[in-house]
Amino acid sequence: MANLRKTHPLLKIANDALVDLPAPSNISVWWNFGSLLGLCLATQILTGLFLAMHYTSDISTAFSSVCHICRDVSYGWLIRNIHANGASFFFICIYMHIARGLYYGSYLYKETWNIGVVLLLLTMMTAFVGYVLPWGQMSFWGATVITNLLSAVPYVGGALVQWIWGGFSVDNATLTRFFAFHFLFPFVIAAATVLHLLFLHETGSNNPAGINSDADKISFHPYFSYKDLLGFVAMLLGLTSLALFAPNLLGDPDNFTPANPLVTPPHIKPEWYFLFAYAILRSIPNKLGGVLALLFSILVLMVVPILHTSKQRGLTFRPLTQFLFWTLVADMLILTWIGGMPVEHPFIIIGQVASVIYFTIFLVLAPLAGWAENKALEWT
């Protein structure tokens, strides 16, 4: 008699995705980040659910309800710290996952890649509305500044901003709807993740060599299930260590002050994982231009598959493009640093140069390097 997991309509789906899935035998630890993102999402939904049980989305009580969670709710401080720092780990895993995709040419699975970019945008939106909920100074002013960017949309901008605010400024209506969105989006992300996996399993995983691995596949369980488990332990160790020993390390001190519309903080800046995009936004001295650059800094990922010129898939055997990849990584770090700095010399010019380099690598240098490497292959 056939095994139940192979015949049962529901178990069969799980079996084909998690047990009997044929996986390339040579995928490295860089392929762990997909499952880690699944763990991050599950952790955020669970901790978020428990926080939502005690949180009130009203401007008069939001800040004190967060204080109440940390002081009076059993292990509330732990749940909140894991949720806040879990977002940071979520974005670390996302950026590693995208970097892996760029390095090894995984973006050539176009549907999987484009759903991934949509997932990134959804996650960024979720994190943004979530940051507003504690209703501290940086929550309020961050919401004001970022939503105000929509006023740069020609003709309908002003009306659009007021529609999102639910009034003439960031107020109670804004907080209430942001809480509703923050509760809803993770489930949209979970649904999009299922699509992401569905399209991935149509083709199977890519591998570090960038060649067809049909001749050498191994089953997902036990090999990669245990490998993923090791990743889970490592990440949870890092997350709990941060949440227990330095919970406020990555936060902004301004958010310990309740929101005050009459006092503007000296430096309005988002959480660290948005600083690179914030630096690109600020590097253009024009509102609409800045907003478009901000948008395109993420959407540029969608044109990467179109601009792939190389005959090889990954960068494993392509030293020229490898150099460009690591230049891009360094450039992202510089942009992250600049995003947290005040708008003054020399930070302005550094940010502008780094922004130009960011787009040049994606749109000009990487396709040129691929073409040059093809030429070099012809000479041998």
UniProtKB/Swiss-Prot annotation:
List ligand-binding residues for a ubiquinone: H201
Q: How does the record classify its membrane topology?
A: Multi-pass membrane protein
UniProt main location, coarse? mitochondrion
The alphabetized UniProt keywords are: Electron transport, Heme, Iron, Membrane, Metal-binding, Mitochondrion, Mitochondrion inner membrane, Respiratory chain, Transmembrane, Transmembrane helix, Transport, Ubiquinone
- Tell me where the transmembrane regions lie: 33-53, 77-98, 113-133, 178-198, 226-246, 288-308, 320-340, 347-367
The Gene Ontology biological process terms listed for this entry are:
mitochondrial electron transport, ubiquinol to cytochrome c
Q: Which parts of the sequence bind heme b b562? A: H83, H182
- For this protein, what does the record note about how its cofactor is bound? Binds 2 heme b groups non-covalently.
Describe its function: Component of the ubiquinol-cytochrome c reductase complex (complex III or cytochrome b-c1 complex) that is part of the mitochondrial respiratory chain. The b-c1 complex mediates electron transfer from ubiquinol to cytochrome c. Contributes to the generation of a proton gradient across the mitochondrial membrane that is then used for ATP synthesis.
The note filed under miscellaneous reads:
Heme 1 (or BL or b562) is low-potential and absorbs at about 562 nm, and heme 2 (or BH or b566) is high-potential and absorbs at about 566 nm.
Q: Which family does it belong to?
A: Belongs to the cytochrome b family.
In Swiss-Prot or TrEMBL terms, this protein is called: Cytochrome b
Q: Which gene encodes it?
A: mt-cyb
